[in-house]
Amino acid sequence: GSAELRMRILEATAERFDREKINCEICCSSDGIFALLCPERKILIADGEAGIKSDRGIDLNSLYGGLYPRELMRIYTCEKKKKTDRCSRFLQAAESLKSELVRLDSQSIDYAKIVAFTLRLWKKNGGAMKGNIGRETKRFVSCITPDGVELNMKAFDSCDRISVVVDRTGAVSARIVDRIRRYALGSGYDVTSFVCSLDGKTVEHIIIPELRFGVFSSEHYHRLLPKKERKIFASRFHTQESEKVKNRLSFTAKAYRSLMNEAFESMIGAREEEEKINYLFRGISDTKEAVDEIAVQLCD
């Protein structure tokens, strides 16, 4: 079905929950609302295309079947799936090359320099030991979109001091970020960790809210730097061995960017097909039937 229609239905459902005094959290992506979460009732209402499995569901294509041309819908949906699958394959290949970049670049890192530097950095910007372990909260601050990698720079507005590690591969910056993160948690300070949107696990940036201090990793797709920054260049933590893999790094980095660009092109194509699908459903303004169906299923 149409993403626009699904979002309108979720918005209408959230308004109904609000009228009925049901606690509801609205979950959004870069494109808009994709889910509603009711923690107290243990209910999740989500876009079926998000990959969440459930024995309950509402098929908008059936619910509004007589209001749009089915054959056009089938064609647009198939084209969108082809381009989405193509994008996924390129992103997976790009992730593999990114891992190879980190592996190659890690061969010439002087780890003793990183340990000494991060210790000095923490002593300068950290706080006193609290005698307990801090709590870590993981968030995404960047996302991969048809327009490229979007980065929410407002996340760093609360910081008075930011150390920016300029690193072409992320091999050095990830280690610096991780060590400062460990120092902070071990000293009892809560940490907000921002995870890489490509692999979903590597911590790229951190903020220590209580200290108003953050560490930011700047690479090819994170060129916009936060204000109040102090730049740290990754090259100072490498030995002369880096010259041996210089050409391989350059070639792999070029291939990585090429794969990412192909992924962006596929996402643009998928977005165009999505717009065609949205156009088919644009004349449907009444979402009451779908909202009522959601309410009935939740009451079963």
Feature annotation, model-predicted:
Residues 2, 47, 62-69, 110, ...:
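Alpha-helix initiation/capping motif
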Residues 14-81, 183-261:
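Conserved nucleotide-sensing/catalytic segment adjacent to the nucleotide-binding pocket
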Residues 72-126, 248-297:
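An accessory alpha-helical subdomain
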Residues 87, 148, 177, 184, ...:
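Long, contiguous hydrophobic alpha-helical segments, chiefly transmembrane helices and signal peptides
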